[in-house]
């Protein structure tokens, strides 16, 4: 999978961009606050129809403009496709090959990207909510079914929590309606837990090999999926559905008392276990960085495994955060097989013997030019 051509109109600090890219390594070089991260963000937005930096789409529109447009020509095994997002103050519109998509969910999955930014180095020791967002964003790209189940689950969770609050404050009395919401939540929750268990197991295997390679066999790594359902049941969605139903029944009185759902995958987490210890609490900073790198590289392999194609990789000033050994491993892992966009303030320190002939672009005050 490659991004061949990108067109921007009124996006952040870019009035207009129209450029083609190398199918291998593309380096965006420039001083700070010139628009390097904005350009990477636009590629991310083209893929996922949302920013990784803000939940307010209006921030993506250039100051004083009515709309922003992001358009790209993407090459896949199935052929070349034009993707387009138009972001206005009224909302977003998505097109594939000039055909309007009624739902954003029908747009997603046509272009897959993986972003690696300095803040991702903290993924192993960040919050459970951050790890859940990470899981959902990546797995949702790989599987339309996962994305659908996640969307449905969030809808029913919101409705159920609102109704639990009504029951708490005696504004509602009908427990039959609560049972209907609970059954739907258990059904979609079971699908999510089963999918997460399967995908995390595969991703863990990839990450374990990478961690061993980086550390020359000194460190073992595996993922420990933390969910309320017993591990022996997670491979069967029907058994997970039954288990969730039993837990909801047991917790119903407490849920009404607290006005919120206490059971379900919205409480999941993933622990990264290095040499039999939770690296977030007991690992060194070096181990945490190696683990974060292994997780990100495992994402690439998992996406290839699930979709049949490598994603596009976005590296936002991350090379400066890695020592020479980790930088070398990252660059060797991606060279020639993964189209990559990386930002940097200087080419100094980048492993030039690995990136022999990158396409270099100069970013300066919202303009992009081939260097």
Swiss-Prot record:
Q: Which domain of life is it from?
A: Bacteria
User: Which biological processes are named by the entry's GO terms?
Assistant: DNA replication; DNA synthesis involved in DNA repair; double-strand break repair; SOS response
Q: Could you tell me the keywords of this UniProt record?
A: ATP-binding, Cytoplasm, DNA damage, DNA repair, DNA replication, DNA-binding, Nucleotide-binding, SOS response
Where is it located?
A: Cytoplasm
Look up keyword Magnesium and say if it applies. no
Tell me yes or no: is Nucleotide-binding among this UniProt entry's keywords.
yes
Xref: InterPro entries = DNA-binding_RecF, DNA-binding_RecF_CS, P-loop_NTPase, RecF/RecN/SMC_N, RecF_2
Coiled-coil portions: none
The GO molecular function terms of this record are:
ATP binding; single-stranded DNA binding
- Specify which residues bind ATP according to the UniProt entry for this protein: 30-37
A GO cellular component entry from the record? cytoplasm
Tell me, in one coarse class, where this protein mainly resides.
cytoplasm
Q: Which cysteines are joined by disulfide bonds?
A: none
Task: Name the family.
Answer: Belongs to the RecF family.
Report the PANTHER family cross-referenced here.
Answer: DNA REPLICATION AND REPAIR PROTEIN RECF
What biological function has been recorded for the protein in this entry? The RecF protein is involved in DNA metabolism; it is required for DNA replication and normal SOS inducibility. RecF binds preferentially to single-stranded, linear DNA. It also seems to bind ATP.
Name of the protein in question: DNA replication and repair protein RecF
Q: Which organism is it from?
A: Lacticaseibacillus casei (strain BL23)
């Amino acid at each position: 999978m490659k991004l061949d051509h990108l067109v921007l109109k009124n996006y952040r600090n870019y009035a207009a961009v129209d450029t083609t890219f190398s199918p291998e390594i593309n380096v965006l070089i420039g001083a700070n606050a010139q628009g390097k991260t904005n350009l990477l963000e636009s590629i991310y937005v083209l893929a996922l129809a949302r920013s990784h930096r803000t939940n307010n789409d209006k921030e993506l529109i250039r100051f004083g403009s009515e709309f922003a447009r992001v358009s790209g020509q993407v090459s896949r095994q199935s052929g070349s496709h034009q993707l387009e997002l138009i972001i206005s103050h009224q909302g977003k519109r998505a097109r594939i090959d000039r055909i309007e998509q009624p739902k954003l969910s029908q747009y997603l999955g046509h272009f897959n990207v993986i972003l690696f930014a300095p803040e991702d180095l903290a993924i192993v020791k960040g919050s459970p909510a951050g790890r859940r967002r990470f899981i959902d964003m990546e797995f949702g790209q790989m599987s339309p079914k996962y994305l659908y189940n996640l969307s449905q689950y969030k809808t029913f969770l919101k409705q159920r929590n609102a109704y639990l609050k009504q029951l708490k404050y005696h504004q509602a009395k009908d427990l039959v309606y609560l049972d209907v919401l609970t059954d739907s939540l258990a059904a979609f929750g079971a699908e999510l837990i089963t999918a997460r268990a399967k995908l995390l197991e595969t991703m863990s295997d990839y990450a374990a090999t990478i961690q061993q390679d980086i550390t020359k066999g000194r460190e073992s790594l595996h993922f420990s999926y933390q969910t309320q359902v017993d591990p022996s049941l997670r491979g069967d969605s029907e058994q997970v559905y039954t288990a969730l139903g039993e837990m909801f029944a047991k917790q119903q009185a407490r849920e009404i008392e607290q006005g919120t759902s206490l059971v379900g995958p919205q409480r999941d987490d993933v622990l990264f276990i290095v040499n039999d210890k939770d690296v977030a609490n007991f690992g060194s900073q070096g181990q945490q960085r190696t683990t974060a790198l292994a997780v990100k590289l495992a994402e690439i392999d998992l996406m290839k495994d699930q979709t049949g194609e490598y994603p596009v990789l976005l590296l936002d000033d991350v090379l400066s955060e890695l020592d020479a050994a980790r930088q070398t491993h990252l660059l060797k892992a991606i060279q020639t097989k993964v189209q990559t966009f990386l930002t940097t303030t200087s080419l100094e320190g980048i492993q030039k013997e690995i990136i022999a002939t990158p396409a270099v672009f100069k970013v300066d005050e919202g303009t992009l030019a081939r260097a």
